[in-house]
């Protein structure tokens, strides 16, 4: 019997290009494609680690990516090779072929044609990476938008999505045992967006994450009691801040981002 294939689509932007190519290829082997998983707006090495661990658990997996940020792209390749996972760079060969044929550096070409737009995009993406997961409280003061919430509410991919909309976004995890930094209470609450989620849904998400990492799915991190405690604490912090709260239960990253963009324009949560 033929062995099934699991396809992982990975990008630091949307996965449309990778998905289109994968779909065309899969049409020739549709009876042997076990699953196709999408990972858009990948913004840090931890996300890459999770993707790699999940792909490594599949007997026959392929990663198709359109990563642009050099540091993350190289890290993805390195990790995939370490675990013997097949990896396809969709954009790289095309860009390299054009560069070889024309003698024009892709970076120079982009900068020449649209320097201001290109540099701004790189700046906000690097900002999202630098101030991800509360790494530096200074990001709270510098950001256009600050996203807060408990673990596994898609804060990082949301900030990467906003970066592609030219918005400097920082994010901060809320944990009962750790008091939020004072900087969070010093900025305009209109810049802060709190993410909440249905406890049962979050329990399932966390259990799946633990499984993908080869850890015990029944760890305290994924228990109903712990999840409810964290969500209650997070919502109390959001109330203290007086910030906008968004329920991300069963919401795609794009949907949550559109809510934020609408609020920033003076609209309301729909």
Swiss-Prot record:
Which reaction equations make up its catalytic activity?
A: N(tele)-phospho-L-histidyl/L-threonyl-[pyruvate, phosphate dikinase] + ADP = N(tele)-phospho-L-histidyl/O-phospho-L-threonyl-[pyruvate, phosphate dikinase] + AMP + H(+); N(tele)-phospho-L-histidyl/O-phospho-L-threonyl-[pyruvate, phosphate dikinase] + phosphate + H(+) = N(tele)-phospho-L-histidyl/L-threonyl-[pyruvate, phosphate dikinase] + diphosphate
Residues recorded as binding ADP, renumbered to this chain, are 149-156
Q: Which UniProt keywords apply?
A: Kinase, Nucleotide-binding, Serine/threonine-protein kinase, Transferase
What are the GO MF terms of this UniProt record?
A: ADP binding; ATP binding; phosphotransferase activity, phosphate group as acceptor; protein serine/threonine kinase activity
Q: Which domain of life is it from?
A: Bacteria
Q: What class of enzyme is it?
A: transferase
Q: Which InterPro entries match?
A: Kinase-pyrophosphorylase, PPDK_reg
Has the keyword Transferase been applied to this entry?
yes
General function of this protein: Bifunctional serine/threonine kinase and phosphorylase involved in the regulation of the pyruvate, phosphate dikinase (PPDK) by catalyzing its phosphorylation/dephosphorylation.
User: What is the protein name stated in its UniProt record?
Assistant: Putative pyruvate, phosphate dikinase regulatory protein
* Organism listed in the record: Thermoanaerobacter pseudethanolicus (strain ATCC 33223 / 39E) (Clostridium thermohydrosulfuricum)
């Amino acid at each position: 019997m033929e062995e099934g294939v699991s396809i992982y689509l990975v990008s630091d932007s949307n996965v449309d290009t990778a998905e289109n190519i994968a779909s065309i290829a899969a049409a020739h082997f549709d009876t042997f494609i076990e699953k196709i998983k999408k990972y858009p707006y990948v913004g840090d090495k931890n996300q890459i680690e999770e993707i790699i661990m999940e792909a490594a658990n599949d007997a026959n997996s392929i990663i198709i990516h359109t990563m642009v940020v050099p540091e993350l792209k190289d890290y993805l390749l390195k990790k995939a090779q370490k675990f013997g996972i097949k990896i396809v760079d969709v954009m790289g060969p095309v860009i390299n072929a054009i560069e070889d044929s024309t003698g024009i550096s892709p970076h120079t070409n982009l900068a020449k044609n649209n320097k201001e737009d290109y540099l701004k995009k790189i700046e906000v993406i690097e900002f999202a990476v630098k101030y991800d997961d509360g790494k530096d409280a200074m990001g709270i003061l510098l950001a256009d938008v600050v996203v807060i919430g408990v673990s596994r509410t898609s804060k990082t991919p949301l900030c990467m999505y906003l970066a592609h909309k030219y918005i400097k976004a920082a994010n901060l995890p809320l944990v009962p045992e750790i008091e939020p930094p004072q900087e969070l209470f010093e900025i305009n609450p209109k810049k802060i967006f709190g993410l909440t989620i249905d406890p049962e849904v979050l329990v399932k998400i966390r259990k799946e994450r633990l499984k993908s990492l080869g850890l015990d799915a029944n760890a305290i991190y994924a228990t109903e009691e712990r999840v409810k405690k964290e969500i209650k604490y997070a919502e109390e912090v959001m109330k203290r801040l007086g910030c906008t709260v968004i329920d991300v239960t069963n919401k795609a990253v794009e949907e949550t981002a559109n809510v934020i963009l609408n609020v920033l324009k003076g609209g309301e949560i729909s």
